[in-house]
């Protein structure tokens, strides 16, 4: 549907790079639901250069996920360039993305993430240095500005383009907003009109209809979906289908949700081992169960699970219980 450098995406729906979430197990699951591009969670440039074991694990890519964008962050040109070169030469990622959007203080105090948004000249300098050092296309994920008084989205996007960046993903919130308030799609539209490289819009795309509205109202090349896909890869499938056909597919049934949740669990166990995976899966299971009536009790029980068997037994028992309630409701209706 559109290209980032020489990488062709089959549609306009992109999975956002969410920290603590977008490992290979989650990305592959979302890819199977039709995402045109999946983005890995951000990785520290210095951690790559220190050969940190956990970080090296975060660079793992399953070939079935591709095309894939791998995101790095840092505040110093030398280390960012060296980390980008490592990713370029030692991973099968298709795209190298630079994080300029993370609003978390522990990132911004290191002059990384959203701190870049205050200086278009630094953006140009850093991006051009990375572009010159690697063969893979380089992109940037950014927010619209630091705060309401410092919104340099257009200048920053132009700096990325001038530096040789192949696309910009723009979240229509400031750093100060974090994830509160509403995303400003007008700024996204302005940025799209100001550069010739692809622009991917991000922020408040919660339904397939939102995705279409963003495309129509801003003219962006793609839509990036983040939190709406947590425990809900059907959001990706339903959005792709809606954009292609205009038809809105039904939400998944309980059994289908639990089945995919268990698949996700097993992939996470394969990736990280049972002990770590089960603990990490607690939050994912809560997301999968969201919106299913009567889930509070089982969500609480899941938070005490330590093994795969415990978690699967709880999920299976809840499925039977929830389906019985659905059947009862249907009879009453």
Where do the PLM segments sit?
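Alpha/beta catalytic cores of nucleotide-metabolism and tRNA/nucleoside-modifying enzymes
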Residues: 1, 9, 13, 19, ...
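N-terminal small/glycine-rich loop or linker at the start of catalytic domains
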Residues: 2-14, 48-67, 102-112, 127, ...
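Short, glycine/charged-enriched secondary-structure capping and boundary segments
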Residues: 29, 53-55, 85-86, 110-114, ...
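Active-site beta-loop-alpha junctions enriched in small/polar residues
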Residues: 18, 43-45, 73-75, 101-103, ...
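Glycine-rich, positively charged N-terminal anion/phosphate-binding segment
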Residues: 1-3, 18-94
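Alpha/beta enzyme core
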Residues: 81-112, 120-197
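Hydrophobic faces of well-ordered beta-strands that scaffold small-molecule active sites
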Residues: 13-17, 38-40, 68-72, 96, ...
């Amino acid at each position: 549907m559109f290209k980032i450098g020489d990488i062709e995406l089959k549609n306009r729906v992109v999975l956002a790079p969410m920290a603590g979430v977008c490992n290979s197990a989650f990305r592959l699951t979302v890819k199977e639901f039709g995402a045109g591009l999946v983005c890995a969670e951000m990785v520290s440039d210095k951690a790559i250069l220190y050969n940190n074991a956990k970080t090296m694990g975060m660079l793992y890519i399953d070939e079935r996920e591709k095309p894939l964008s791998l995101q790095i962050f840092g505040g110093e040109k030398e280390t960012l360039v060296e980390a980008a070169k490592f990713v370029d030469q030692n991973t099968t990622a298709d795209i190298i993305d630079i994080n300029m959007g993370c609003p978390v203080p522990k990132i911004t105090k290191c002059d990384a993430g959203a701190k870049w948004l205050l200086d278009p000249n630094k953006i140009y300098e850093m991006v051009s240095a990375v572009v010159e050092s690697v063969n893979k296309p380089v992109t940037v994920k950014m927010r619209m500005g630091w705060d309401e008084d410092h919104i340099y989205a257009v200048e920053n996007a132009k700096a990325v383009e001038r530096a040789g960046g192949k696309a910009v993903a723009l979240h229509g919130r400031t750093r100060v907003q974090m994830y509160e308030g509403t995303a400003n799609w007008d700024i996204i539209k302005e940025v799209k009109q100001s550069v010739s490289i692809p622009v991917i819009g991000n922020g408040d795309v919660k339904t397939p209809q939102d995705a279409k509205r963003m495309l129509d109202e801003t003219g962006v090349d793609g839509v990036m979906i983040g939190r709406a896909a947590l425990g809900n890869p059907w959001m990706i499938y339903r959005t792709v289908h809606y954009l292609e056909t205009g038809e809105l597919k039904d939400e998944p049934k309980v059994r289908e949700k639990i089945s995919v949740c268990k698949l996700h669990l097993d992939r996470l166990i394969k990736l990280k081992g049972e002990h770590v995976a089960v603990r990490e899966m607690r939050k994912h299971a809560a997301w999968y169960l969201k919106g299913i009536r009567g889930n509070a009790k089982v969500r609480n029980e899941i938070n005490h699970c330590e093994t795969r068997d415990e978690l699967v037994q709880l999920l299976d028992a809840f499925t039977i219980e929830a389906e019985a309630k659905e059947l009862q409701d249907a009879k009453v209706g």
